[in-house]
């Protein structure tokens, strides 16, 4: 049983009219279904920021070679518009790299970014920045970030960026590419402009009770930095650990993660 002792306030938002939309923010609740949303809505006494969504749709999530998808194939479909095989990341069923929304944005002169609460070699962030036929090829996937070109990256997973078996220091390589590489929220908060690659934890970021509103802060920092481009930006934000606690059948942490994701929308 999960009980939210103090429900959080939710306001009704009115979409602006008469303005041309130039920024795109894609928010993904990893593994999140209608069940998660309704449970979180019930726990918060019938209110969610998600209720402000103007449209609702359903998608068939099967991948190219299986009925049951995974975050590799499913995330690739979201990132590129193409279905691929189970466990593949950012490539088509033949293993050829696909262009993601992040790289398409850069090509069109917009800035791009991702902000997640998981390790950066996890499938969803990798789907937008990397290319591999196997999502478990973690060291290879992480190395792809050096050349991905995305302007803002926030997440966990420092252990595969340094002290690697191949001897590469990916943080050093990223700095050589013009990135600033803060290793904590405090360091990130001080940055006022430029490209950022922030990895705060060895693997995933901490649980909500410990990290607080870190995802919301990291997302707002992305908007602040990417928004300096007058052409606009694309940003993908993921509530990454919802999926973990669904697998673990841990309703307490699952609801904490779902509410954290919902409050990030605010």
Locations of regions flagged by a protein language model:
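N-terminal catalytic scaffold of extracellular/periplasmic and nuclease hydrolases
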Residues: 1-164, 168-188, 259
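Beta-strand elements within well-structured catalytic alpha/beta cores of enzymes
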Residues: 21-32, 105, 199, 232-240, ...
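Generic structural signal for well-ordered alpha-helical scaffold segments
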Residues: 102, 142, 223-224, 266
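Active-site His/acidic residue clusters
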Residues: 123-129, 202-205, 231-232, 236-264
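Conserved alpha-helical scaffold segments that buttress catalytic/binding sites
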Residues: 159, 175, 193-195, 205
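Active-site regions of oxyanion-processing enzymes, predominantly non-cytosolic
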Residues: 184, 188-199, 218-240
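Binuclear metal-dependent hydrolase catalytic cores centered on His/Asp/Glu-rich metal-binding motifs
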Residues: 204-215
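Short, well-ordered amphipathic alpha-helical segments that serve as non-catalytic structural scaffolds
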Residues: 219-222, 260-266
């Amino acid at each position: 049983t999960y009980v939210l002792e103090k429900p959080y306030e939710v306001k009704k938002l009115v979409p602006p009219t008469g303005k041309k939309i130039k920024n795109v923010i894609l928010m993904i609740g990893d593994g999140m279904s209608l069940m998660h949303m309704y449970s979180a809505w019930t726990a918060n006494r019938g209110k969610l920021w998600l209720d402000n969504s103007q449209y609702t749709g359903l998608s068939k999530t099967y991948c190219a070679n299986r009925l049951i998808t995974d975050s590799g194939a499913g995330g690739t479909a979201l990132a590129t518009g193409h279905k691929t095989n189970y466990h593949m990341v950012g490539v088509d069923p033949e293993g050829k790299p696909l262009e993601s929304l992040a790289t398409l944005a850069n090509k069109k002169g917009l800035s791009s970014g991702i902000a997640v609460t998981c390790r950066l070699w996890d499938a969803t962030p990798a789907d937008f920045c990397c290319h591999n036929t196997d999502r478990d090829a973690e060291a290879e996937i992480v190395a792809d970030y050096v050349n991905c070109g995305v302007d803002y990256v926030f997440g966990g997973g420092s252990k595969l960026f340094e002290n690697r078996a191949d001897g590469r220091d990916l943080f050093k390589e990223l700095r050589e590419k013009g990135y600033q590489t803060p290793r904590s929220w405090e360091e990130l908060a001080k940055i006022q402009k430029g490209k950022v690659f922030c990895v705060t934890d060895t693997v995933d970021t901490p649980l909500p009770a410990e990290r607080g509103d870190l995802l919301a802060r990291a997302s707002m920092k992305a908007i602040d930095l990417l928004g300096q481009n007058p052409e606009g930006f694309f940003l993908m934000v993921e509530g990454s650990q919802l999926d973990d606690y669904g697998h673990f059948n841990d309703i307490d942490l699952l609801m904490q993660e779902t509410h954290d994701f919902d409050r990030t929308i605010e």
